[in-house]
């Protein structure tokens, strides 16, 4: 079972990295359009009577919230990536598996390094460019993802009958 989980976490990590790469390959215009659609969806779900607003009022709200949606997406992508990398190490026979500091540090650093290379990649995409702020947000998300997996494992190990051998 542990081997299957390990393979699943590795595949999830690879899938997330590929997904992030493809999102970064979108031109500035394509990326902005996707962000606007996602923002519209969130606003229609969470803002009462959003659908009753005029198109102009809707676009104004979308413009106001789109920045935050983009930054939350950055945070979430890298939280998920770091979480899955942590899972890959946790379900393996890694020599530092029982060292919580290293188990947090290594996935966080791997995801942060990927965030840096992702920003370099955006230099070569029309209408996009690198952003130190995005790397910082990505890194914070990656740290959160690693901490989240660590906390979950601590909680699960305290559940009777779930202690590892």
Tell where the protein language model's regions lie, with residue ranges.
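"…centered on the first transmembrane helix and the immediately adjacent amphipathic helix/loop
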Residues: 1-83
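Alpha-helical transmembrane segments of integral membrane proteins
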Residues: 5-12, 102-106, 110, 133, ...
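Small-polar-interrupted transmembrane alpha-helices in polytopic inner-membrane proteins
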Residues: 15-20, 103-123
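Membrane-proximal cytoplasmic C-terminal regulatory module of class A 7TM GPCRs
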Residues: 37-42, 155-165
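Helix-boundary and loop/linker segments of multi-pass membrane transporters
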Residues: 56-60, 95-101
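Membrane-interfacial alpha-helical segments at the cytosolic side of multi-pass membrane proteins
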Residues: 78-93, 141-156
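Membrane-interfacial, low-structure loops and terminal tails that flank and connect transmembrane helices
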Residues: 93-99, 160-165
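Interfacial helix-loop-helix junctions of multi-pass membrane proteins
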Residues: 115-139
């Amino acid at each position: 079972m542990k081997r299957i989980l390990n393979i699943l976490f590795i595949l999830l990590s690879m899938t997330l990295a590929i997904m992030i790469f493809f999102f970064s390959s979108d031109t500035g215009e394509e990326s902005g359009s996707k962000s606007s659609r996602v923002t519209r969806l969130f606003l229609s779900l969470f803002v009462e009577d959003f659908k009753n607003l005029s198109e102009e009022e809707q676009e104004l709200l979308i413009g106001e919230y789109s920045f935050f949606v983009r930054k939350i997406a950055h945070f979430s992508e890298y939280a998920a990536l770091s979480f899955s990398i942590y899972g890959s190490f946790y379900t393996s026979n890694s020599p530092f598996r029982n060292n919580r500091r290293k188990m947090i540090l290594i996935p966080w650093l791997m995801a942060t390094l990927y965030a840096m290379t992702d920003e370099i990649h955006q230099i070569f995409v029309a209408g996009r460019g690198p952003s130190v702020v995005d790397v910082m947000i990505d890194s914070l998300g990656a740290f959160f993802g690693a901490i989240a997996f660590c906390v979950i494992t601590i909680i699960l190990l305290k559940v009777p009958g779930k202690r590892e051998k």
